[in-house]
């Protein structure tokens, strides 16, 4: 959000420098431009509050008056749900009419920035349950069975870019993303696109 607001603010200032008639306007971008999916209830609410705090800090730092009444507003565009598999409220996979598990849909966006959960493939059944893990692998049959959980986010982002639904994506992962079955997910991205600004051991 802060980067988006910085870009908009800089554009307004440059427009004003070109012509006084293009005087800098009040920022239009705000928390409503930030969409998100978070499974944990506490983390979802924390994300909503963090976005609002960032908004208030940016407005004050750049000489604008922040909202006062109320200071924080509901932010329903950060959803509390599974990001890779359609599940019910108990976290059980929901099957379609043909009895198949379904990939979760992501909100329409231009850019995705994600910090997916890190869980090795050998721990998925013990941590997520056998039914969930089997359903996840069935729904994402293009992801190798031995891939870590984080790979489903990489595959999801790339699939959307490949069909023009997404412009860019930035993901956080561990170094294990470069090895084993995980590497196959990266290979499909490199074969059809490009990975840049990849920072190792950060």
Question: What is each of the regions a protein language model found here?
Answer:
Residues 12-28, 182, 188-189, 195-197:
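A compositional/structural signature marking long, glycine- and acidic/polar-rich segments
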Residues 9-26, 56-74:
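Short mixed-charge
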Residues 24-32, 74-82:
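Extended charged low-complexity segments that act as oligomerization/scaffolding linkers
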Residues 34-37:
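Conserved SAM-binding motif I beta-strand of class I
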Residues 8, 41-44, 52, 56-62, ...:
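Signature of N6-adenine DNA methyltransferases within the class I
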Residues 1-7:
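A phosphate-binding catalytic loop at a beta-strand-loop-alpha-helix junction
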Residues 47:
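Conserved SAM-binding loop
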